């Protein structure tokens, strides 16, 4: 299994939203899959405990990754 860093998640300056930032280069290189209706997607993974820590102010940022075979 391989993991590729795709970007990061952080709280907005106002604190009412999460900001998601993806590397355009990583996104271009990311593995894609087709849904049953033929739409193309890029699957991403974020650790939910780390997102909670960002939301609660315990962490400033957490990573977004893609896991592939």
For every predicted segment, state its role:
Residues 1-69:
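Single-stranded nucleic acid-binding surfaces, predominantly the OB-fold ssDNA-binding core
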